[in-house]
């Protein structure tokens, strides 16, 4: 099982969640929302071979935490994975969008200078702005657009730029989410939960529930579930080879 976008440190009891991950053999990318949270999450995860921790600066927090971008850049040499980063154009965060763009551009430039990173990218309400930034920094790494909700034209542009995509059970509950997922390139897709924000009724999804969307995704792609599982694992294994990192 693969959960390539999970806020592990934001669960009420992350240790219990980690024990569940260990028990089930789930592969997890634990994204963070601030650089200051990265070291704590790394310590929490320890040496678990199936869990990676991404260095993040969430766009919703940029207005308050933009000064942490220097710390972010200072930590970049220690990780292959970056996220959650990006731009949020939803109404509550439009007031900081110019600052968000500036911070995102600086992060991408730092990633490019460091040889590229695997990037878990937020683009809600700002897909065009995110793609503009990625196009300006083509060597920043491998962008994986998490829970992409842009237009079909923006999806086509993202595809042409070589972007990857992570999709999950909540995304595939909506008609638009299913329509977008149906046209995403299967060899550049992974599964996610966005837990604990992604929910199953009144409860947060758990990382091992990322595959709750497999039947729906297999149907959208015209594949058998076993074939889809193999493709997702092949994608995950290929990903680290696409960036330079000697840490």
Residue positions per predicted region:
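Mid-domain alpha/beta scaffold segments of enzyme catalytic cores
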Residues: 1-247
